[in-house]
């Protein structure tokens, strides 16, 4: 948890990437990859050249023993003559509600992700998780706190969100988001749905919010195997479900959308369409 807390400091320091000129990229990526024909999992960061000094300064100030090395040759997850598949992470519920964060885990959630990569064959299989970070242009904290104040006054959470008119398609109101199973009723009887909503919104607004694209790409000799690799990696995100808040779901891409996905993946471009508003603690997790 100490390391994860330090990563949260790193992301906070990288918020200044927003001070970029209009014609320059204002985002960076962190990637976990297992290239085809290589049995070593790579942790990779891609930063615009004009922000390289910022990145190195942030990393070395927080992790003084870290070694930052320029990698001029990019990795390649794609199997020659094979099939490649990809998906974007989306939020299953309203983004005002947070996913489960690292401070509530009794184990390192990263180990579960690493385990899925370790099962991929050295030759004939490759995969990557690419997270693109970009400063949010919208003041989510202010908007979410406005909704929070209404809920604290007794306005039902779904009504408070509707009244805010905030976020358009991003703010899809979940139906029965607070419905509980019979097994959970005893545990929750002391908490009303509104008190749970208040706690979750307070957690969401507890640290700055950025935008993130989360892409998962996989490649193998057959589509079935590529789909299996993709499914296994997607499943590793299940541990991040907050039963009273939010969870990740994944949109599989096909045809033209898949072509655009791999273009954006290869060039590490940011997609506004698949932007997820996540606070720094969620991103760290």
Residue ranges and their predicted role:
Residues 1-285:
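Extended, folded cores of ATP/NTP-driven motor/assembly subunits in large transport
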